[in-house]
Amino acid sequence: MEGKIRIEVLFPEIANLYGDLENIEYLKKSYPEVEVVETHLTGEPEFMKETPSLIYMGTLTENGQRLTVEKLSEYTDKLIEMINEGVYFLVTGNALEVFGGEIEDVDGSRDCGLKIFPTHAKRDMMNRFNSLYLGRFEGMDIVGYKSQFTHSSYGRAGVYEGNSIADLYGNFDRKRSAPCCGETFSIYR
């Protein structure tokens, strides 16, 4: 990122399920020169006026996912354009599912995503997956957790045989697909 760093936080009023916004607070305190703008569900995304250095979106409830898809659906072309231009995205938890094809419930009902990435998620609200990670990384103790109702896969069948993430996104045959790679779009769960 060159020049002034501008971070746009999408929908902080609903995309903060696990306190994800503290990531942004940490950045603001570590780098006071960073400008942080927030886009709320009731407003137009700031990225329509000025392209940010980074777009951040935190974990959502299932209804929050629906509201986010509804809101961002009219901006899909701009999102794809920004991905292709190398704008960085940091998306936490289940928010990535918003950018995928669909979220399928065990009862067969489906919520559509933005269809930017060729992912498919299966949701089972009666069986939450929880895990705790205790380990070390570069000499530091790490504690992490994972708590989710969904499991995502690439493509409908969850089978991918390419050589890289760039192959996956670059070869996704869709009229408005975004040939992008993991260098600009990051997630963690």
Regions found by a protein language model. Give the residues of each.
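Short, well-ordered coil/turn elements that cap or connect secondary structure elements
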Residues: E2, Y31-E33, N84, S109-D111, ...
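A short acidic, often aromatic-flanked loop/helix-cap motif at beta-alpha or helix-coil junctions
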Residues: G43-F47, K122-D124, S153
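A broad, low-specificity signal for short, low-complexity segments enriched in glycine/proline
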Residues: F11-L21, T51-S53, G93, E97, ...
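Fold-independent oxyanion-binding glycine-rich loops
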Residues: P12, T39-L41, G58-L60, T92-A95, ...
